[in-house]
Amino acid sequence: MFYLNAHLEINKVVDVVMSLSKKFLKPSVASNQLRLLFTAAERKVNYPGHVPLSPLQRIFLVAGSAIMGLKAPWRGGDMISVLGDASGQPFFLHRLLNKMLVDKTGREILKDKPRMTSKSLNLPFLRTLPPNTLGKIYVDWIDKEHVGPDTRSPTRFVDDPEEAYVMQRYRESHDFYHAICNMPTNIEGELAIKWLEFVNMGLPVGALSALFGPLRLNCEQASRFRRVYIPWSIRNGLNAKTLINVYWEKELTNDIEDVRRRIRIEAAPPLV
């Protein structure tokens, strides 16, 4: 029911965006260039599920999803995903794609284009691994937090297929950041990971969550977050390998301390 309601809210925001763009458009006086600014009718669908947007529609969608994401951060998964799609173009996703293209593992990921699902990750197998392995720690973490790899929204509003995959990979890797850093999914844990993602990869959706999310913390939580977790996130975000270039599926049987050492990331201070 939660998942359905989240998607209904997304569709509501998208419907408002489309109707506003039509309201602003006056065909009798608009030039062809102006029409292209307001309407996506001339734009082609580039991959299954792609929703083309005009520049104005993209602005509306960024604003609407940002407001909804801030209003209800506990539902942030789907609405923040829309914000990530809409705000990543035209600069930020292209820059992240370039970071993958200049990295050997990044190029391998782009060539293979793996998707993370319960089936592809083989969760029953991960439960049989030794307790010190990344795979075992990951599957224990998702069991404890009651999350899973099948709940990530598909990319819809990114025009370029390669950049759309980069956004999908960014989204699907999120739980591995939690698991390898030993960070829960409560508000403080999510914000710490968003700070880490923003500093490390620079997508604006991370900046929005990182900058405005702490407003949802009480005084004690906010003080601890400023003293402990923001410094941890910034230090690790700057020091770590670009996390989009980690081929998590090939690290599952490896010792987690070895993985942390190679990607230069620390476990977070315990969040209790």
UniProtKB/Swiss-Prot annotation:
Keywords: Lyase, Membrane, Metal-binding, Mitochondrion, Mitochondrion inner membrane, Ubiquinone biosynthesis, Zinc. It is found in: Mitochondrion inner membrane. Disulfide bonds: none annotated. It is a peripheral membrane protein. GO terms for cellular component: extrinsic component of mitochondrial inner membrane; mitochondrion. Zn(2+) binds at residues 174-175, 178, 190. This protein may be expected to contain an N-terminal transit peptide but none has been predicted. This is Ubiquinone biosynthesis protein coq4, mitochondrial. It comes from Schizosaccharomyces pombe (strain 972 / ATCC 24843) (Fission yeast). The gene is coq4.
